[in-house]
Amino acid sequence: MEPAIKYRLIKKEKHTGARLGELITPHGTFPTPMFMPVGTQASVKSLAPEELDAMGAGVILSNTYHLWLRPGEQIVKEAGGLHQFMNWKKGILTDSGGFQVFSLAKNRDITEEGVHFKNHLNGSKMFLSPEKAIQIENDLGPDIMMSLDECPPFFESYDYVSKSVARTSRWAERGLKVHQHPDYQGLFGIVQGAGFKDLREQSAKDLVSLDFPGYSIGGLSVGESKAEMNHVLDFTTPLLPENKPRYLMGVGSADALIDGAIRGVDMFDCVLPTRIARNGTCMTSHGRLVVKNAAYAHDFTPLDDNCDCYTCRNFTRAYIRHLIKADETFGLRLTSYHNLYFLLHLMKQVRQAIMDDNLLEFRQNFFEMYGFNDKNPKNF
């Protein structure tokens, strides 16, 4: 049986671990490295599917935990799955719900069977097992699904992380056994291990032996420094098969996308661009711009003079500032559109730089313009 998700390697960058490729899904083939907008509740906040399509989004992420609680996976299944429910004709990826259980839910209790917790909406008692997570995701109907994992804090003790990694591996095997639709839904295993090299190696070895169609790198962007995250990626991505996609979960700042691509990551997602947009913070080629600040009240230039998105072609900083100060929803739509377009366009530039074998030069120029003032990474 052909796997639902396939990866085609097109080219490796000469000077780094970066790779240009294609993610092949039941709902289309998409170029990688790629950024995936997050639609937590089966909607990318304030934006229509047509707008996401127009700006070049290929795969959208939705959150299993939130959709399980509301409206419930059975309603989504009844609608014909997430693609029909939200009218998105391209790729959809769902997480397992594990991260939300560990970050949002109260009174959680982790056992070998799964996680007991209280619903953060109404306080009711809930239970999520590896099997239940897969059943929910099968019903939601995305192209790509995640195994249930525990995401331990980056600075947790070695002993705790060691036990957590072993349990996550057992949970991955249990989830794989009950996965109903491997022919049109690809299930990824999630590599954990915090900052411990030997535990990351063990986690990757366990999961690669199960032959998932793709692999996620979890437990990063959870409070550690950028240098620590890059260090973990340096020794983690080489552990994963070259013929499978690699997905770095929950990472969405411009510098982290470039540095992740340099280290061989193919897929990224994060709520960051839309979350900061709702606070009036915009990503531009010259760095972050807080457009609601008084300094922009009389500024009749675009958010970013190097951007050709709908927002920058049609509206000024002064107007967008006015909308946000007046609590007009249109302002949030404009900043959200711009930030997502900015990251999707950035990944297009990264792909071109890989093709041209000048990704380190691109990184240096981008970081100087953006204001990161960082040196080229030397160790891959």
Swiss-Prot record:
The gene is tgt. Catalyzes the base-exchange of a guanine (G) residue with the queuine precursor 7-aminomethyl-7-deazaguanine (PreQ1) at position 34 (anticodon wobble position) in tRNAs with GU(N) anticodons (tRNA-Asp, -Asn, -His and -Tyr). Catalysis occurs through a double-displacement mechanism. The nucleophile active site attacks the C1' of nucleotide 34 to detach the guanine base from the RNA, forming a covalent enzyme-RNA intermediate. The proton acceptor active site deprotonates the incoming PreQ1, allowing a nucleophilic attack on the C1' of the ribose to form the product. Substrate binds at residues 95-99, 149, 192, 219. One of its GO terms (cellular component) is cytosol. GO terms for molecular function: metal ion binding; tRNA-guanosine(34) queuine transglycosylase activity. GO terms for biological process: queuosine biosynthetic process; tRNA wobble guanine modification; tRNA-guanine transglycosylation. The active site is at 95 (proton acceptor), 269 (nucleophile). Keywords: Glycosyltransferase, Metal-binding, Queuosine biosynthesis, Transferase, tRNA processing, Zinc. Pathway: tRNA modification; tRNA-queuosine biosynthesis. This is Queuine tRNA-ribosyltransferase. It comes from Lactiplantibacillus plantarum (strain ATCC BAA-793 / NCIMB 8826 / WCFS1) (Lactobacillus plantarum). Residues 250-256, 274-278 are annotated as: RNA binding. It comes from the Bacteria. Homodimer. Within each dimer, one monomer is responsible for RNA recognition and catalysis, while the other monomer binds to the replacement base PreQ1. Belongs to the queuine tRNA-ribosyltransferase family. InterPro entries: ArchSynthase1/Queuine_TRR, TGT, TGT-like_sf, tRNA_ribo_trans-like.
